[in-house]
Amino acid sequence: SISLNNSSYSFNDDLNESDIKRHIKYLSSDELEGRFPGTKGSELAIDYIASNFKNYKLAPFQDNSFLQFFDFSNLEDEKSRVANVIGLIPGNKNKDEFIVIGAHFDHLGYGGAHSGSLEIGSKEIHNGADDNASGVAGILELAHKLSLNRNLLNRSIVFVAFNAEEQGIFGSKYFINNSQIPKDKIITMINLDMIGRLRNLSLNVSG
């Protein structure tokens, strides 16, 4: 549950399991080739997330776009132009205060050397269902449900799908250093990472 306008709203009955599975299935499909930054698969993931933000009636975060572009160089010094995907639900009372909910959407592509894969001698698609299609599915579902209940929101909520996390949290660094939001106006940040499975029935929460 989450506190909204001095009341508690529970998502337990509203969460759509089929939508969550659909998001994970697409984002971790072979078509997206492991979502390595700067690749066609990464661009497909960006388009998918932005399209869902638009369908859920989120507002573009800056420059009338859901995309926040930045330059990325991988460990082999190959350069590309990549993007975070950002959507906004304006608050009603304290709209100049922000809660940020994020998850990285990139993964390891085909693996191999300099990818971060544990199997550096193998070149095959690393689908990344848990890491981190699961987290992206989480923010998409939260974006959908909170958008439907936007009249209950005191503060504004920013949803961010970060790019280039696996190679050194580049997307989140760029977001925080180039955001239109003053840092002292970010009340809290919730990051969803690898939420697709539980180990020993335990859930780790840190902050």
Residue spans for each PLM region:
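Second-shell loop/turn segments in exported
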Residues: 7-14, 30-40, 71-75, 120-132, ...
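Acidic/His- and Gly-rich active-site-bordering loop/insert found
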Residues: 27, 53, 75-115
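Metal-dependent peptidase/peptidase-like ectodomains
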Residues: 94, 162-207
